[in-house]
């Protein structure tokens, strides 16, 4: 429940549109809804501005669906990350408006389309191989109501590709830099823009990249100002933080 939805609910009870019994039934789900396999945080949007997101890894398909159905039953938009096509196909049987970004492994269900911000988030990626992380970040940012623009395959091996889009990137309120290998893109971008850069190291690379650890350490040790770093392959975390900045 968002702050606006809470205020609207209070008004309907006050005006008599909803009875006291209906109010009690509604409030029964606070502060969480227990569905057996999970306790859904029904107040998170009220506290943080965005509702609970379902992280799929480690959960069975049945558990994911049970949680999604419980969130959807309250009319709240649903975002599921690190998921699969099996969940999408089963969810589509009960929620026809469901969307699935297969590369980003993200499912979204929007009962109410969020109004997009006037300012935008730029997602800049070093290579095509970083695409899965880019798509996770993109779907998350859009779900949270952000105008979001992607600039793909613009890594340091060909700086002219980055420079060609620099004017648009500089127009963003916050930049997400997605890169594997040595992770140099974040530092280069931070030296060219005057907005926060959120760096996402990816697990793309050969042996000595250690599954993204080399990029993570390089980004943490950036000489350029304004770089903050999230965990390896964490497109969701980068987009969530970027959304908070973009909504300021």
Regions found by a protein language model. Name each.
Residues 53-54, 120-126, 175-177, 229-230:
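Short glycine-rich or small-residue beta-strand-to-loop segments that form or flank ligand, phosphate
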């Amino acid at each position: 429940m968002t702050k606006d939805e809470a205020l609207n609910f209070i008004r309907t009870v006050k005006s008599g549109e909803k009875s006291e019994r209906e109010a009690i039934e509604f409030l029964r789900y606070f502060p969480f809804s227990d569905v057996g396999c999970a306790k859904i945080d029904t107040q998170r949007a009220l506290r943080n501005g965005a509702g609970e997101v379902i992280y799929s890894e480690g959960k069975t398909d049945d558990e994911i669906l049970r949680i999604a159905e419980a969130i959807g039953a309250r009319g709240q938009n649903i975002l599921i990350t690190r998921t699969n096509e099996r969940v999408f196909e089963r969810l589509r049987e009960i929620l026809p408006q469901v969307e699935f970004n297969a590369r980003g492994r993200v499912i979204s269900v929007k009962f109410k389309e969020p109004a997009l911000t006037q300012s935008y988030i730029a997602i800049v990626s070093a290579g095509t191989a970083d695409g899965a992380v880019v798509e996770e970040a993109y779907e998350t940012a859009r779900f949270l109501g952000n105008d979001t623009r992607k600039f793909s395959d613009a890594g340091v091996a060909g700086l002219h590709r980055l420079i060609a889009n620099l004017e648009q990137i500089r127009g963003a309120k916050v930049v997400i830099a997605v890169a594997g290998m040595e992770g140099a893109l974040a530092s280069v971008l931070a030296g060219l823009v005057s907005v926060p850069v959120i760096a996402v190291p990816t697990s793309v690379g050969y042996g000595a990249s250690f599954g993204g650890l080399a990029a993570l350490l390089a980004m943490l040790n950036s000489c350029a100002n304004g770089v903050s770093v999230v965990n390896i392959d964490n497109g969701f975390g980068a987009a969530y933080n970027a959304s908070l900045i973009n909504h300021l």
